[in-house]
């Protein structure tokens, strides 16, 4: 039985490679934790958005039902035509359909949120108010990702050192047990040293390892550049989304509420027709829906920025 020990430097560099691989695995574990956290927050944002849309369509359906009941009385009294009466029925039916679709989307979002939370039962949050997630305009990419990229390149460099160490003499140790009659249990130990006579095969392996290490360095640098660029883009996008949300909060939402309230009031007083009423209601609803979408876009961007920066 003979066991090769390799060169004196090979075990050392293999140990260095093992430590590097362990550190790389730890960084990858940290990345997975961050991505799981981000995925839960994305699902939470999607749930809040779906819930807000469901509430929006519920309110629109209630308004349409009230206006439809009013239209029935006005049609029976001869104040509106059959065409206007049909338009109001169509509006009520459309709002009901939208509300049902929003409810289905909310159910899907709730199931997805429970799934990413690894829960077998529905997760019912206490606070379901649509709001902006706390976010900071981080300047630096996440050190977890940067370290992971460096560790990947370092593994290839460790492989270069291992291949270089094979230029040195390799040691081996052997043991044998023989039985030569009439003698038994004849044990012997052997120690061997081997020197490479031709270096060309090993030079080729070293050259290949160097090329792989250089490629890994280029890839790591490209990943770092892409990460910095992504963080910068997310930071700019978050700032833009914040301004968009501020526009709705400061002015547009108030105008939408006033538009709907005045349109319903004018219709109740018979000072506007159904066509103008429907147009005003649609405009008001679209503004509130755009606000919900703007908040959702802001929150998703904030989650992405938190994931890739610090």
Q: Where do the language-model regions lie?
A:
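Short segments within alpha-helical structural elements
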Residues: 94-119, 255-310
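A glycine-/polar-enriched beta->alpha junction
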Residues: 1-16, 27-34, 38, 52, ...
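Transmembrane beta-strand segments that form the barrel wall of outer-membrane beta-barrel proteins
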Residues: 169-179
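Periplasmic alpha-helical coiled-coil/stalk elements that build and connect Gram-negative outer-membrane
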Residues: 16, 27-29, 35-144, 234-237, ...
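Short coil/turn linkers that connect adjacent helices within long alpha-helical scaffolds
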Residues: 31-34, 77-79, 165, 180, ...
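Residues that define the transmembrane beta-barrel architecture of outer-membrane proteins
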Residues: 154, 185-189
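C-terminal structural cap/anchor segments
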Residues: 208-211, 215-247
């Amino acid at each position: 039985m003979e066991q090769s020990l390799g060169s004196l430097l090979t075990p050392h560099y293999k140990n260095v490679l093992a430590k590097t691989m362990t550190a790389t695995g730890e960084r990858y574990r940290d990345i997975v934790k961050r991505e799981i956290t981000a995925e839960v927050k994305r699902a939470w944002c999607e749930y809040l958005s779906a819930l807000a849309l469901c509430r929006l369509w519920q309110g629109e359906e209630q308004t349409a039902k009230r206006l439809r009941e009013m239209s029935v009385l006005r049609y029976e009294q001869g104040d509106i035509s059959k065409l206007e009466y049909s338009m109001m029925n169509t509006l009520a039916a459309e709002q009901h359909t939208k509300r049902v679709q929003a409810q289905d989307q909310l159910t899907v979002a709730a199931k997805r949120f429970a799934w990413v939370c690894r829960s077998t039962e529905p997760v019912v949050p206490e606070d379901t108010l649509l709001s902006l997630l706390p976010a900071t305009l981080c300047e630096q990419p996440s050190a977890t990702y940067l370290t992971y990229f460096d560790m990947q390149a370092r593994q290839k460099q460790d492989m270069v050192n291992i291949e270089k160490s094979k230029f040195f003499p390799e040691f081996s140790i052997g043991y044998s047990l023989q039985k030569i009659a009439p003698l038994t249990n004849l044990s012997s130990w052997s120690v061997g040293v081997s020197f490479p006579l031709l270096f060309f095969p090993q030079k080729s392996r070293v050259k290949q390892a160097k090329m792989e290490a250089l490629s890994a360095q280029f890839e790591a640098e490209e990943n770092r550049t892409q990460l910095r660029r992504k963080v910068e883009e997310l930071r700019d996008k978050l700032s833009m989304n914040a301004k968009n949300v501020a526009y709705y909060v400061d002015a547009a939402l108030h105008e939408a509420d006033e538009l709907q309230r005045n349109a319903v009031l004018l219709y109740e007083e018979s000072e506007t027709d159904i066509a103008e009423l429907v147009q005003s209601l649609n405009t008001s609803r679209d503004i509130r829906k755009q606000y919900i979408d703007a908040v959702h876009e802001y929150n998703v961007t904030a989650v992405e920025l938190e994931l890739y920066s610090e």
